[in-house]
């Protein structure tokens, strides 16, 4: 029987330290050594999943292949280790309690008093162990900060792990902040010392300290942290601010993290194969070209709401030796009559080589998105629409090309005369919000000779989805008769999955979320095409 190894990553001092990037980077280093790696994100909130959470609260909702609506860190994991994860790889307090209470109602606890310890903690451990089956190493990131009340059951569960599977099979890594006090000109270790003290009071002694810092860590500071936090000096790892998140694995490898982890877990330390990763990072850091894509969205105040889109643009940019700048344009700014003047100014200032309209929900800012699409279509600016972005493209085309004045989606206007976008038939009897959309990977059949077919290079494609509305099949014919090509449909021919306008040099949209499948070594074709078209290339 294969011995499973578990690595638990906690965070201290403040949130948003980069635990997710640290975990993903370690996953990359271990996979580069030939190990089979799985990754888990624990979120100590009471929701079952992230699906009902506002982008302003939680950033984007990352959709897995099997339809899980999960934390955005799963996106980092997938991109860094180049593996598809599942909905089960995101554990929440809600999922754990739901499972325990369901078992209690079934009488599975045989009359025992159901308590946090042992029932909740056992459920957490069982979930992690089950996900670890078949893997050499499972990396588990504990969301939140040590000291948070809501994290305590998870911390207790991972404390017990070393007794359950043997301490030689468990590694604890603590990510903490070393703040730099400019007035004093020095890094301060006290917050990290107190964070480790808090962790040790729970019964967890970290094996490795990863210190987030904007300045180099001196030997003196390493020795001090090693002494007060009871770790080896070599286990104090510097994690300085990087030029790109994709440089972090290389920086941590230079610090000796990969070698240290394999040593502490009694695993063979093989030479990591990071050549392709280094080439990718070099292209990101040293581009030869530059373009600016305008992202017209509703949630642009919080860039994490579109995280996978920005990463997909980085991947496509690197493939084309191009730095992709993003011009964040709030869609509500384009709802005035002067929207064309604003977009004209962006073009004159070289701030609008291409336009991307991402997904979203609700009618706020929708007319601004429609105006941006009209501008892209009429001025032949490379355009990519995603999910709601495709629906808005259909509305714009129906109004301004087909002559269907007032055409709309029933999401925005239930009484529209021309419902060119309508609720999916299977959604019409559903009232619950959580986990009820059309979620996960679905196939589409592409029409040969179209732009979509040229970009993908094959007839059948699978993309991830997250939507309730579709292009109304009753309007397919009139749209196509006026020059809109429905270049990809569901296998039954009912649902429009891709649309394009062939007379424009690059005008394409999809009902799916292609950004979730883009990887550093495999940029998504739609984003690659957008960057190439924005550079002036004709897509052949």
Swiss-Prot record:
Pathway: Pyrimidine metabolism; CTP biosynthesis via de novo pathway; CTP from UDP: step 2/2
Region (Amidoligase domain): 1-267
Binding-site list for CTP: 15, 148-150, 188-193, 224
Keyword terms: ATP-binding, Glutamine amidotransferase, Ligase, Magnesium, Metal-binding, Nucleotide-binding, Pyrimidine biosynthesis
Annotated catalytic residues: 387 (nucleophile), 513, 515
Known EC number: 6.3.4.2
Catalyzed reaction equations: UTP + L-glutamine + ATP + H2O = CTP + L-glutamate + ADP + phosphate + 2 H(+); L-glutamine + H2O = L-glutamate + NH4(+); UTP + NH4(+) + ATP = CTP + ADP + phosphate + 2 H(+)
Position of the signal peptide: none
GO BP field: 'de novo' CTP biosynthetic process; CTP biosynthetic process; pyrimidine nucleobase biosynthetic process
Name of the protein: CTP synthase
Organism encoding this protein: Methanocaldococcus jannaschii (strain ATCC 43067 / DSM 2661 / JAL-1 / JCM 10045 / NBRC 100440)
Lineage per the UniProt record: Archaea, Methanobacteriati, Methanobacteriota, Methanomada group, Methanococci
UniProt gene name: pyrG
């Amino acid at each position: 029987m294969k011995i499973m190894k578990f690595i638990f990553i906690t965070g201290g001092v403040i949130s948003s330290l980069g635990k997710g990037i640290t975990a993903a980077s370690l996953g990359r280093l271990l996979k580069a050594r030939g190990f089979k790696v799985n990754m888990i994100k624990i979120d100590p909130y009471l929701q079952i999943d992230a699906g009902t959470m506002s982008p302003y609260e939680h950033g984007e909702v990352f959709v897995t292949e099997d339809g899980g609506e999960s934390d955005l860190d799963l996106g980092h994991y997938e991109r860094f280790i180049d593996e598809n994860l599942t909905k089960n790889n995101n554990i929440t307090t809600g999922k754990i309690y739901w499972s325990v209470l369901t078992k209690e109602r079934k009488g599975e606890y045989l009359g025992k008093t159901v308590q946090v310890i042992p029932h909740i903690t056992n459920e957490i451990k069982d979930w992690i162990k089950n996900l670890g089956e078949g893997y050499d190493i499972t990396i588990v990131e504990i969301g939140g900060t040590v000291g948070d009340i809501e994290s305590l059951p998870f911390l207790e569960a991972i404390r017990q792990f070393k007794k359950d599977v043997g301490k030689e099979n468990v590694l604890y890594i603590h990510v903490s902040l070393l703040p730099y006090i400019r007035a004093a000109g020095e890094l301060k270790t006290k917050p990290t010392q107190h964070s480790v003290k808090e962790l040790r009071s729970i019964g967890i002694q970290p094996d490795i300290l990863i210190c987030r810092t904007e300045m180099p860590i001196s030997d003196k500071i390493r020795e001090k942290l090693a002494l007060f936090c009871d770790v080896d000096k070599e286990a104090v790892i510097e994690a300085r601010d990087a030029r790109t998140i994709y440089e972090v694995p290389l920086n941590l490898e230079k610090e000796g993290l990969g070698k240290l982890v394999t040593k502490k877990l009694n695993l063979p330390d093989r030479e990591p194969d990071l050549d392709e990763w280094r080439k990718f990072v070099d292209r990101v850091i040293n581009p030869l070209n530059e373009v600016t894509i305008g992202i017209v969205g509703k949630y642009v105040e919080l860039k994490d709401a579109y995280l996978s889109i920005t990463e997909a643009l980085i991947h496509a940019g690197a493939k084309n030796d191009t730095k992709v700048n993003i011009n964040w344009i709030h869609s509500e700014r384009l709802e005035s009559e002067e929207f064309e003047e604003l977009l004209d100014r962006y073009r004159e200032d070289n701030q609008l080589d291409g336009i991307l309209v991402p997904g979203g929900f609700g009618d706020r800012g929708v007319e601004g998105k429609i105006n941006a699409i009209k501008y892209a279509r009429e001025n032949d600016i490379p355009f990519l629409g995603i999910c709601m972005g495709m629906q808005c493209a259909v509305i714009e085309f129906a109004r301004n090309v087909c002559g269907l004045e007032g055409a709309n989606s029933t999401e925005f206007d239930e009484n529209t005369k021309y419902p060119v976008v309508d609720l999916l038939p299977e959604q019409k009897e559903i009232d619950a919000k959580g986990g009820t959309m059309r979620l996960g990977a679905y196939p589409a059949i592409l029409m040969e000779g179209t732009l979509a077919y040229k970009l993908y290079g094959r007839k059948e494609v699978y993309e991830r989805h997250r939507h309730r509305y579709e292009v109304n099949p009753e309007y397919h014919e009139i749209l196509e008769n006026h020059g809109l090509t429905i270049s990809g449909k569901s296998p039954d021919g009912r649902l429009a999955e891709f649309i394009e306008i062939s007379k424009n040099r690059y005008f394409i949209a999809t009902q799916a979320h292609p950004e979730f499948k883009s990887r550093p070594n495999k940029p998504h074709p739609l984003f690659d095409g957008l960057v190439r078209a924005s550079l002036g290339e004709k897509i052949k």
